[in-house]
Regions:
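Bilobed "Venus flytrap"/periplasmic-binding protein-like clamshell domains
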Residues: 39-43, 47-62, 115, 119-175, ...
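Periplasmic-binding protein-like
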Residues: 38-41, 110-122, 146-151, 165-167, 204-266, ...
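Boundary at the C-terminal end of the N-terminal hydrophobic targeting segment
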Residues: 20-27
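Alpha-to-beta junction loops
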Residues: 66-67, 85-94, 135-137, 179-180, ...
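Acidic, polar ligand-binding/catalytic clefts
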Residues: 58, 62, 67-133, 143-144, ...
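Bacterial N-terminal signal peptides
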Residues: 8-20
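Extracytoplasmic small-molecule ligand-binding "clamshell" domains
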Residues: 27-100, 170-174, 261-265
Length: 280
């Protein structure tokens, strides 16, 4: 047997062994669920993975046999165009159903804006039509449905204090989402009109005695206060959408537990309400 024949045979054996050892690694390779995350926006997400969306992303990824990989970007205008649509990430959490720039999943919870005040103030305000509101100092997130509704009712002026809903910690860090709730707890405002998950989280965090009234939709006046919340993927990515919806259905109870643990005020999904109305 020649030296060349021996070497050739040895190379064949080594190649076969390398290929055989490589196959299991490929089979066991964990794929990534690439999430568009806000780096500093509790209660929703942060880089320490402490938010609602961080926890839900972990649950969904685990169900799909994947690991979570984040692209951090403040959730402001331009997120879809600059980050999701350029392929830097594949899924956004916590978007309203019907948000047109993306392909959205079936919703995984429903919540809304709340009217909140301290229980020890002796107030009994149940709606935006209560005449007491014209005499109280109201904190409200600007350019939101409750803000518009106050204007429709002529509640404007010095007794209305505006707060930011959208937040970028790189600019105006003092306008963090919980500031309105913390000002309410401190007595800086009498009543707060605030997005429910923000109100519930910061009230629970501070162990504050707050009364929170979920605002009812008023279709006749164009006031919509409750929203179904979905995940969003790039338009056309029906495969990922389907996988996410399947995982959301399987993990419904676990996701609900996460939301309740964060103090999110929950409403029946729109589909459930429609079924209840048509039930015999």
């Amino acid at each position: 047997m020649t030296r060349q024949t021996i070497l050739a045979g040895w190379l064949v054996v080594v190649s076969a062994l390398l290929c055989a050892s490589a196959r299991p690694a490929q089979a066991d390779e964990v794929k990534e669920l690439r999430v568009c995350g806000d780096p500093n926006n509790l209660p929703f997400s942060n880089e320490k993975l402490e938010g609602i969306e961080n926890k839900i992303a972990d649950v969904i990824a685990k169900d799909l046999g994947m690991s979570v990989a984040y692209t951090w970007w403040p959730h402001q205008r331009g997120l879809v165009k600059r980050v999701l649509n350029t392929g830097r990430c594949d899924v956004m959490l916590g978007i309203p159903k019907g948000y047109d720039p993306v392909l959205w999943t079936k919703p995984y919870y429903r919540t809304g804006y709340v009217l909140a005040y301290r229980k020890d103030r002796g107030l009994k305000v149940r709606s935006l039509d209560d005449p007491q509101l014209k005499k109280l100092k109201i904190g409200v997130q600007v350019n939101t449905p409750p803000h518009d509704a106050l204007g429709q009712r002529g509640i404007v002026g010095d007794n209305v204090v505006g707060y930011q809903l959208m937040f970028d910690s790189n600019f105006h860090a003092e306008d963090y989402p919980g500031k309105l709730v913390e000002d309410l707890i401190a007595g800086e405002v009498d009543v707060a009109l605030v997005w429910g998950p923000i109100a519930g989280y910061f009230a629970k965090k501070k162990a504050a005695p707050l009364e929170m009234v979920l605002l009812e939709d008023r279709p006749e006046s164009g006031n919509r206060f409750a929203f179904d919340i979905s995940m969003g993927v790039r338009k056309g990515n029906k495969e990922l959408k389907g996988k996410l919806e399947d995982a959301l259905a399987r993990k419904h109870d676990e996701i609900k537990h996460i939301l309740e643990d964060f103090g999110v005020p929950l409403l029946p999904a729109a589909e459930e309400k429609a079924r209840d109305k048509t039930a015999p």
